[in-house]
Amino acid sequence: MTPRTRLRRFLRAAAAAALLAQPLPARAAPGGEDQRWMWPTGSPSPVLSSFAPPAHDWLPGRRGGDLDVPGGTPIVAAADGVVAFAGPVAAQPVISVEHERTGSPVWATYVPAQAEVEAGQRVVRGQVIGRVPPGADHLHWGARTGRRAYTDPIRLTLGPVVLKPWE
């Protein structure tokens, strides 16, 4: 390596380090509210099966997570939203809630879930929306961001990633 090449590499590394060392301006969530989702059980629950999206939308995969909760457990809204659906799908009781999250809707689904709400009803974060039916041994919790796009609902409980300056 020539001295000129070494100098160029050093200058590039120094410029990158200087850029990374600059503090980024903090950005609050719209309205200043907490954008994190709440666990549907009110607090973290043991996860039986984690989110494992398929390589293609038509393939099998886990489009949410299964939480280890007994029948009768109250289910709470993960965030403020509007109940999109509450009723049976393929003989399973389902609740789906549409949440606005920084301008983009996210639909949370809870299966099996005996509804204590109706479609079109506005709900607030932490409000009881249903219960895990008696005899059920888990709750499937999903999050959909589009017609065929899914995300891990457990990651939404963590909130946005925030970079902090080095001091």
Q: Which positions does each model-derived feature cover?
A:
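Secretory targeting and sorting signals
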Residues: 2-28
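Short acidic/polar mixed-charge low-complexity motifs
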Residues: 43, 73, 102-106, 147-150
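Zn2+-dependent peptidoglycan hydrolase active-site motif and core
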Residues: 78-114, 137-140
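Conserved beta-strand positions that form and line the central face of beta-propeller blades
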Residues: 66, 96, 109, 131, ...
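Generic beta-structure capping elements
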Residues: 50, 98-100, 113, 144, ...
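Acidic, glycine-rich catalytic/binding loops that coordinate metals and/or anionic ligands
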Residues: 4, 29-43, 68, 115-124, ...
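Short glycine/threonine/proline-enriched tight-turn/helix- or strand-capping micro-motif at secondary-structure
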Residues: 45-77
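Short, well-structured beta-strand-loop connectors
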Residues: 74-84, 116-132
